[in-house]
Each structure stands twice: as structure tokens, then as C-alpha cells.
């Protein structure tokens, strides 16, 4: 059996993936990988090298600190261990190509992965909370959007979710009381969406035509739309601590930016 030691100043996932990818090119080999992670001092490196020297094997390492990388290489030689640097040559070449120096901060890839999984978790939550689904989970949302149909609740929710926010949206339907769970949410997390009546009529009419349905029904009737918006306003007035955003003629990006600005600054217009 051959032993391979994986030395890293972070989690060791990067060096292990590279080595495992290379090993797939070799069939029927008996290899054992030993991961030595978070080696950020000379003492850490020396202890790990002493451990590796007990059952010698080749060392592959990814240390972004040049001094530590050189120390590892020298100390490995003293112990008659072969050590191969997987990242320093790449960093030097990229620095030359890009014209800037690397940050040399351990664990950045792991941090990026953590941010990615946070966004995916937010997206998963948001999909499950779309259009008033699972109101029992409203209290878990970072942001709760409320408004009548076709005020961009779903597109806004998904846009914010991809920025890492868990978002729920609740439709406000005239004559139907919103779920009681909505009123148990921290008021500062709730955003009411408003829109110009004629603009909403135009959006709904276009929607009906796209679905090949009659655009002359009550769904796109101006008087009916005005009544729905009045219903919204009454609910918003009962909850003055909610943020209210006018989405008329705004892109999803613009509306999302305003929502986040309000949240970050605590401004209430």
C-alpha cells in the first residue's frame, strides 16, 4: 500500500480533489490518503511531518503562504520525505498573467463554497414558500413579501434568494384574511408591494392574452383592480411598521435594491 499525505492550510478539500482526480487515471492501485489540514504555523507543519515520517509516503501540499510552503519543503527533505507543491507554481503563473498579487489567504475556496450553499439553501426555502405555501414557516423567512397578484412577488423572491435571503411571499386576495402566521412575523421583515392601478391592469391583460384567456374578465378590470389595491392599503395601514414599496415601472433588480436599501438603513418612506 502506498501512502499519500495531503497538507493544507485550510480544510484540505482542494488538494484532496486534485489528487483523487489524478488517481482516477490509475486502475487497481492500493493507496491510502492522509489529510493534514489547517497547518498555519511552523509547529503545525513540523508535527504533521513527524507523523508522516513514521509511515513514509509522498506529500502533496497547498499552502498559500510562501514562507510556510518553503519551510515545509525544506523540513520534508530533512526527513527524506518527497513533498510536491501543487499551488505555488500556479499562483505565480496567475499573478504574472493577471498582473496582480494573490491574496494568500487560506480557506477562500471553502468560504466561497459556504456562500454558495447558503444561497442554495435560501433558494430552496424560497421555492417552498412561494405564493403563500407553508405559512407555518413564515417566521423563518428573512423577508416576507405581500401584495396582490402580478406585483412581481415571485420574481422578487427568487432574485433576493439568489443573494442569500430566505424569502416568503404571501398573496393578498380581496375579501380573504391573510394567514394568521403573517402577523406573527417580525414587522421589520415584512414588505408590502404596491403598484399603479392602470399599470397593473396592463400587466394582467398581457398575462391573460399570453394564456389565451379573455382579457375582459374581472381579473384585469380597472375598477376591480382599484378595489384590490384599496384592500391592500387598508391592510398596510393596520401595520404601519411594514415597509411599503411601489414597484410601478420598476425592474425586479430596482425593486430588490430598494428593499435591501430599506433593510440595511432602516429607512421607512
UniProtKB/Swiss-Prot annotation:
This enzyme catalyses: N(tele)-phospho-L-histidyl/L-threonyl-[pyruvate, phosphate dikinase] + ADP = N(tele)-phospho-L-histidyl/O-phospho-L-threonyl-[pyruvate, phosphate dikinase] + AMP + H(+); N(tele)-phospho-L-histidyl/O-phospho-L-threonyl-[pyruvate, phosphate dikinase] + phosphate + H(+) = N(tele)-phospho-L-histidyl/L-threonyl-[pyruvate, phosphate dikinase] + diphosphate
Disulphide bridges: none
- Binding residues annotated for ADP, in chain numbering: 147-154
What terms describe the molecular function in GO for this protein? ADP binding; ATP binding; phosphotransferase activity, phosphate group as acceptor; protein serine/threonine kinase activity
Provide this UniProt record's keywords sorted from A to Z: Kinase, Nucleotide-binding, Serine/threonine-protein kinase, Transferase
Enzyme Commission number(s) of this protein: 2.7.11.32, 2.7.4.27
Its domain of life reads Bacteria
Per the record's keyword annotation, is rRNA processing included, yes or no? no
* EC supergroup of this enzyme: transferase
Job of this protein: Bifunctional serine/threonine kinase and phosphorylase involved in the regulation of the pyruvate, phosphate dikinase (PPDK) by catalyzing its phosphorylation/dephosphorylation.
Family per similarity comment: Belongs to the pyruvate, phosphate/water dikinase regulatory protein family. PDRP subfamily.
Q: What is this protein called?
A: Putative pyruvate, phosphate dikinase regulatory protein
Q: Which organism is it from?
A: Geotalea daltonii (strain DSM 22248 / JCM 15807 / FRC-32)
